């Protein structure tokens, strides 16, 4: 039995109230989140622009002298209580970097192929926008939780907006009156961008919310029960804690071995612990941002194990990360992400203008 016109109109009125007030309360922060996320599409290029001392003409080459000097810098950082890691050259950033997290961004020196340090200024660069986009510059837990909640609100607001205008989607696509009265012109801009870029808006909001969901959603009770009742795994021989990290073995042979073990042409970064060296594959050539890992002993460099993320849940999460971060994208697709992000930002800004 079909619903009566009065019922449908009441539903649209309720959706309009929800769309208006939730959009007003969360819209300003969401506009900032989308604006900084749009700029983050070119975060590496922004960092290059802010570090003109680093030449970008050389191809991404990883050499033994650069890795040897990087290992020295890394050990010096560890001696000061820091936890630096190595970011390996890639097609977008063809230099070796020794990075350390300062609470908001990863900063550190960049090394040339012969091992010398480029005299570049220390700056967060494009990572400032990336960090603001995901944490509002408010810390990993508090900021990520707030951004995740705002993402959920945006999904509700977008759904309510479609419920309001579902009967007029086609007119909203073809009717644009830039010289009409200002409220009408702003509404047309809001509706046009909202309808045209609605698929992108839902995709980018949903994937971003899922990525941050662990910040606010607890583990399912079934998983907790399974972990509690599953038989204990065989314990590995305990390793006595080291007073200080052991010296780092030659890294270039380990990187080449990791490429073979991970069946990849490039590795992206290297993490260090007092006992292990973890080399992660590059995910710039695949839609699934899963990053399988080859792990070696820090003491002598012998191979320990490979950690692959091939489960269905890991593949699903990797797909969400790949779609959101767009590291796989070509230069043209990256510009398409950027233009879509600008359009969504303009849509939110136009909607906010209607209130003032």
Model-derived regions: residue spans:
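Conserved histidines in hydrophobic membrane contexts and catalytic metal-binding motifs
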Residues: 1-356
